[in-house]
Amino acid sequence: MKRKNNKFIEISIAFILGIALGLYGQNPDYFTNLISQKSLALSALQIKHYNISELSRSKVSTCFTPPAGCTKFIANQIDKAEESIYMQAYGMSDALITTALINAQARGVKVRILLDRSNLKQKFSKLHELQRAKIDVDIDKVPGIAHNKVIIIDKKKVITGSFNFTAAADKRNAENVIIIEDQELAESYLQNWLNRKASN
């Protein structure tokens, strides 16, 4: 009985494959166009390309751990914010960055944060400390994990990279941070932030 079932499956697959190849032979452009349309649709919705000449006009700074020091690098950028800070974070437990965000809120900077849901249960998360400071903090309810590490400052500067906003990222892990000062790029990141916020 098992052999008969296997034989039936093999014949069915061969039959379907034969039909597909026959259709492709008659009209190969249909399949090519279909794939191209799908790819173009994805690009239009999710992908923004930047060429080297565009980014070469931007001011770019980097930081790497080890050695420690990227936390201060990020906090200094937050201290320079004048109008707005939009943040996305997976881990949010660093005291220095939290203090910089609270100070920014206190001096009138608009601070908005999206965190991964794990912060609701993590012992060292600064979620509640940020909320007590009247900062608008929301949970990104993506089905998986909200793994972004992004800070958008004054809609013209983007901080991103592998660096979680935690003490471990600065003192124990091998991480990277990149800061790009480019208004168009910042607007692209901000639009993604707003889309994630709206989806919640």
UniProtKB/Swiss-Prot annotation:
<dbReference type="Pfam" id="PF13091">
    <property type="entry name" value="PLDc_2"/>
</dbReference>
<feature type="active site">
    <location>
        <position position="149"/>
    </location>
</feature>
<dbReference type="InterPro" id="IPR051406">
    <property type="entry name" value="PLD_domain"/>
</dbReference>
<dbReference type="GO" id="GO:0016891">
    <property type="term" value="F:RNA endonuclease activity, producing 5'-phosphomonoesters"/>
</dbReference>
<feature type="domain" description="PLD phosphodiesterase">
    <location>
        <begin position="142"/>
        <end position="169"/>
    </location>
</feature>
<keyword id="KW-0443">Lipid metabolism</keyword>
<dbReference type="GO" id="GO:0006793">
    <property type="term" value="P:phosphorus metabolic process"/>
</dbReference>
<keyword id="KW-0378">Hydrolase</keyword>
<protein>
    <recommendedName>
        <fullName>Phospholipase D</fullName>
        <ecNumber>3.1.4.4</ecNumber>
    </recommendedName>
</protein>
<feature type="signal peptide">
    <location>
        <begin position="1"/>
        <end position="25"/>
    </location>
</feature>
<dbReference type="GO" id="GO:0005576">
    <property type="term" value="C:extracellular region"/>
</dbReference>
<keyword id="KW-0843">Virulence</keyword>
<dbReference type="GO" id="GO:0016042">
    <property type="term" value="P:lipid catabolic process"/>
</dbReference>
<feature type="active site">
    <location>
        <position position="154"/>
    </location>
</feature>
<keyword id="KW-0442">Lipid degradation</keyword>
<dbReference type="InterPro" id="IPR025202">
    <property type="entry name" value="PLD-like_dom"/>
</dbReference>
<feature type="active site">
    <location>
        <position position="147"/>
    </location>
</feature>
<comment type="similarity">
    <text>Belongs to the phospholipase D family.</text>
</comment>
<dbReference type="GO" id="GO:0004630">
    <property type="term" value="F:phospholipase D activity"/>
</dbReference>
<keyword id="KW-0732">Signal</keyword>
<dbReference type="InterPro" id="IPR001736">
    <property type="entry name" value="PLipase_D/transphosphatidylase"/>
</dbReference>
<comment type="function">
    <text>Could be a virulence factor.</text>
</comment>
<keyword id="KW-0964">Secreted</keyword>
<comment type="subunit">
    <text>Homodimer.</text>
</comment>
